[in-house]
Amino acid sequence: MLTTEKLVETLKLDLIAGEEGLSKPIKNADISRPGLEMAGYFSHYASDRIQLLGTTELSFYNLLPDKDRAGRMRKLCRPETPAIIVTRGLQPPEELVEAAKELNTPLIVAKDATTSLMSRLTTFLEHALAKTTSLHGVLVDVYGVGVLITGDSGIGKSETALELVKRGHRLVADDNVEIRQINKDELIGKPPKLIEHLLEIRGLGIINVMTLFGAGSILTEKRIRLNINLENWNKQKLYDRVGLNEETLSILDTEITKKTIPVRPGRNVAVIIEVAAMNYRLNIMGINTAEEFSERLNEEIIKNSHKSEE
């Protein structure tokens, strides 16, 4: 759970008042600048957000009649308000300090400019409050594409990752991948701290990839864009041989491209994954070989049908 105390420690902010409220949870990544509230309009006050007071808000506050000031500040300090932050190192109004002390609302001062602090806060909160999950698999950076390799236990995921590392690609996580959703369409994968940089090879044991292959062979985290699912070759199953069938894998409501690769002796899975990653990059650049082939095939069929009619 993210608390105001962790926010203060991580961003190195200065607490002025409301120390007893540091244990308040932060549940909303949005940030509010209470301009209308300063004017007395609290009907739609987003009190569960962090409140940011900059030069504009405080200069307007100084124009308020003395009789209204204390009341406005008390209304800002709701029980669910995680923090009120004054930017640019400005001096908080005395009425705000008193209200924060009395109502246990953390009052914080930051030296950053308002827009700069808002950017820092947004980045921090989006990461800290992102939805998370974990998946059994291996995450590798192949030609800049985050490839999540999945499949049944013993199918050869770790061995394939080792071959990819030897070919110059970078390991992110083996066996267990911790995934968090930053945006609606952005998934970031990283390893648990316990097994960071480690790779388990059956018959060999656990190896430290960074020690063996150097710092350039590992990454601490990577955006997941492509899923390669390995499965034992099934003669009864029809596998995609053209590339027109688009499969997807849903993780935390985010869809990523999925390719199912049948595994059998003699197939170089690492090379296939390299080609899949390069082909994915071509696809997002607007080049789809499967569609081009399909169009050429259709044109040839139409041409031949016209010849037969003649």
UniProtKB/Swiss-Prot annotation:
Lineage: superkingdom: Bacteria
GO cellular component terms attached to this protein's record: cytosol
Keywords in alphabetical order: ATP-binding, Carbohydrate metabolism, Kinase, Magnesium, Metal-binding, Multifunctional enzyme, Nucleotide-binding, Serine/threonine-protein kinase, Transferase
Ligand binding (Mg(2+)): S158, E200
SUPFAM superfamilies linked: HprK N-terminal domain-like (SSF75138), PEP carboxykinase-like (SSF53795)
UniProt catalytic activity: [HPr protein]-L-serine + ATP = [HPr protein]-O-phospho-L-serine + ADP + H(+); [HPr protein]-O-phospho-L-serine + phosphate + H(+) = [HPr protein]-L-serine + diphosphate
Enzyme Commission number, as recorded: 2.7.11.-, 2.7.4.-
One of the record's GO molecular function terms: phosphorelay sensor kinase activity
Enzyme class: transferase
Region of interest (Important for the catalytic mechanism of dephosphorylation), ranges: 262-267
Biological processes, Gene Ontology terms: regulation of carbohydrate metabolic process
Amino-acid positions noted as binding ATP in the UniProt annotation, renumbered to this chain: G151, D152, S153, G154, I155, G156, K157, S158
Residue span of region Important for the catalytic mechanism of both phosphorylation and dephosphorylation: 199-208
Role according to the record: Catalyzes the ATP- as well as the pyrophosphate-dependent phosphorylation of a specific serine residue in HPr, a phosphocarrier protein of the phosphoenolpyruvate-dependent sugar phosphotransferase system (PTS). HprK/P also catalyzes the pyrophosphate-producing, inorganic phosphate-dependent dephosphorylation (phosphorolysis) of seryl-phosphorylated HPr (P-Ser-HPr).
Miscellaneous comment: Both phosphorylation and phosphorolysis are carried out by the same active site and suggest a common mechanism for both reactions.
Family indicated by similarity: Belongs to the HPrK/P family.
Record comment regarding domains: The Walker A ATP-binding motif also binds Pi and PPi.
Protein name: HPr kinase/phosphorylase
Species whose genome carries this gene: Staphylococcus aureus (strain NCTC 8325 / PS 47)
Lineage: Bacteria, Bacillati, Bacillota, Bacilli, Bacillales
